[in-house]
Amino acid sequence: MVGVTPQSGKPRTLAEKVWDDHVVRTAAEGEPDLLFIDLHLLHEVTSPQAFDGLRMAGRRVRRTDLTLATEDHNTPTGYADPSFNTRRGELLTIADTVSRTQIETLRKNCAEFGVEIRPLGDVNQGIVHVIGPQLGLTQPGMTIVCGDSHTATHGASGALAFGIGTSEVEHVLATQTLPQSKPKTMAVTVVGELRPGVSAKDLILTLITQTGTGGGNGHIVEYRGEAIRKLSMEGRMTICNMSIEWGAKAGMIAPDETTFDYLSGRKHARRGADWDAAVAYWKTLATDEGAEYDTEIILDASKISPFITWGTNPGQGAALDGVVPDPQDFLDEVERGAAERALAYMGLTPGTPFRDVPVDVVFVGSCTNGRLEDLRAAADVIRGRKVADGVRMMIVPGSYQVREQAEAEGLDKIFIDAGAEWRFAGCSMCLGMNPDTLSPGQRAASTSNRNFEGRQGKGGRTHLVSPQVAAATAVVGKLAAPADL
C-alpha cells in the first residue's frame, strides 16, 4: 500500500517514507538500522583519510556509479591569483601547500579508485551542494551523504541528505551503506506569505534566531506550509542548507510540481516512461494525513523582515530595522555571557542601529546563496549603482555552469560595472581555507551560512545576510536593505 508501512498501516511522514525505503537491515532494538545510500558526494577536505583506509584494507569503492567528487573548498577563485589562467580558469598551481596537496590527493585517489571527478576547469565543477542538484543527480526520495555539514541542502528536493564524518565516508565508499539510528522528526510549518523584499535567507535566519542553534536537536526537519510551497527550488535549497545551523540532522521539503519542473531535462534526470514512473513515485512521498511528528513549530512568514546576524553564531540575529542588543537584556546567564563575548569579538556597541554598522567586504556566494537566482537577486539591486568607496564586493558563482549562465544573461557586466569582482566558482570566502579571506578586524556582509569567530579569516567579523541585503550593503557601505536605496 502506497504511503503506509506494510506492517502497521500507520500514516508516515516524508522522512519516515524515505528512511523505510532504504533500510537494508533492521537491527535489534536500540541498534542502528543499515541504510542504503543512493548518492555519495566527495570533496578534497574530508576524503583523503577515507581513501587511505580503503587502500590499507585492500578494498575498492563498491559503487563508483553512485559516487561523485569535485574540488571546491580549497580552490582559488580570483583572476589575480597565479593559480589561474585568465582565459579558461584552469588550475595551474596553488601556492598554499596544504590546499595544493588536498586537491592533488583527491585527483590521485579518484584516478586510482575509478571515481568520477569534476576538477577545476571542468564545465560541471563547482561547490558540491550546487552541482548535485544542477546536474540532476539530486532527486526526490534518495538518500544522499557527503563529508560536509551542509549536505542537507539536497533535502530541498525531497531527499534525505545529511553530512557524515570521515570514518563514515570510508564506510560508504566500501559498502554503499551506512549504520544510522532513526532520528526524531519535526515539522516547521510556515504560514502566510513572505513580503516583497524578504527572502528565504531571511526566513531561515529568523527561524534559527527564534529557536536557537540547538532548536533542531538532531531531528529530521520537514519544512512545509504556504510560504515554503511558494519558494523556488533555489530558495528551498537555502532553507534546507542551513538546517544544521540550528542543530537539525537534515532538512526536507516534499517534492511537488516546482521540484519536477526544476529537475526535468537535467543531465541525470530520467527520460520518457522512466520519468513518468519516477514522478508517480515521487508524488507518493508527501507526508500522509494524520502522520505524527515528534515536534511541531509554526512560523508566520508575513511577520518576517530583512534579517542579519550580529554575533558569532547563526542564532544571534535580528531584524535589520533593529539595534545591536544589550547583553543585559538576556535573562539567561549563559546567553548573556555569549552575547557579551560575541559583541566584544564583533566590535559592536549595544544600542547602535544596525544600519549604522559599516562593512569592509561584501561576499555573494557559497552553497547557501551562490546559485543563479541568488546572483540575479543581487544584480537586480545593484544594477546601475556603484559599490561604495572603501568596500570590496566579491561575486563568486557556486559552479562553473552558474557562472556561464550568469554571463549569458549579462549579470557579470552589471557587477563589474558596479565595481564588484566577478570570480570563478568555489566555496571562496565562506570559509578560510583558500585565498579569499578577511583580514583581522575586517567586517563582512556575507551570504554564507556561518559566522563563527575566524570562519572567514582570523579576526574577521561576519554578518550573515541575504543576496538582496548584501547588494544594498555594498552600495551604502553600511548594513542596508534594498528599500534604503
From Swiss-Prot:
Cite the annotated pathway: Amino-acid biosynthesis; L-leucine biosynthesis; L-leucine from 3-methyl-2-oxobutanoate: step 2/4
| Co-factor remark | Binds 1 [4Fe-4S] cluster per subunit.
User: Where along the chain is [4Fe-4S] cluster bound?
Assistant: C367, C427, C430
Cofactors needed by this protein, per the record, are: [4Fe-4S] cluster
Q: Top-level EC class, please?
A: lyase
Annotated segments matching region Disordered: 439-462
User: Which Enzyme Commission number(s) are listed?
Assistant: 4.2.1.33
A Gene Ontology biological process term? L-leucine biosynthetic process
Mark out the compositionally biased spans (Polar residues).
439-451
Could you tell me what reaction this enzyme catalyses?
(2R,3S)-3-isopropylmalate = (2S)-2-isopropylmalate
Role description: Catalyzes the isomerization between 2-isopropylmalate and 3-isopropylmalate, via the formation of 2-isopropylmaleate.
What GO molecular functions are on record for this protein? Answer: 3-isopropylmalate dehydratase activity; 4 iron, 4 sulfur cluster binding; metal ion binding
> Which Pfam family, giving just one, matches this sequence?
Aconitase
- Gene3D superfamilies, alphabetized: Aconitase, domain 3
Which CDD domains does this chain map to?
A: IPMI
Q: Which family does it belong to?
A: Belongs to the aconitase/IPM isomerase family. LeuC type 1 subfamily.
What keywords were assigned to this record? 4Fe-4S, Amino-acid biosynthesis, Branched-chain amino acid biosynthesis, Iron, Iron-sulfur, Leucine biosynthesis, Lyase, Metal-binding
How it assembles, according to the record, is: Heterodimer of LeuC and LeuD.
Query: Which NCBIfam families does the protein's record reference?
Result: leuC, PRK05478.1, PRK12466.1
The name this protein goes by in its record:
3-isopropylmalate dehydratase large subunit
